[in-house]
Amino acid sequence: MPKMKTKSGAKKRFRVRPGGTVKRGQAFKRHILTKKTTKNKRQLRGSVGVHDTNMVSVRAMMPNA
């Protein structure tokens, strides 16, 4: 049976925290920023955790993490 490989796109987008939760970057922060308010852009900084409903999919993409 072949090795289970991590999806390269998931490898670039997600990081697994020591507790087992997964963190991801915020969306909507790449372009068309002029019409977004300063408050909105500030709140999009940093990273957030992956929601529980998506955790199974993310875990399936990263079997070795």
Swiss-Prot record:
GO terms for molecular function: structural constituent of ribosome. Keywords: Ribonucleoprotein, Ribosomal protein. PROSITE patterns: RIBOSOMAL_L35. Residues 1-25 are annotated as: Disordered. Coiled coil: none annotated. The keyword Transmembrane does not apply. It comes from the Bacteria. GO terms for cellular component: cytosolic large ribosomal subunit. Pfam families: Ribosomal_L35p (PF01632). One of its GO terms (biological process) is translation. The keyword Ribonucleoprotein applies. Residues 1-16 have a biased composition (Basic residues). Belongs to the bacterial ribosomal protein bL35 family. This is Large ribosomal subunit protein bL35.
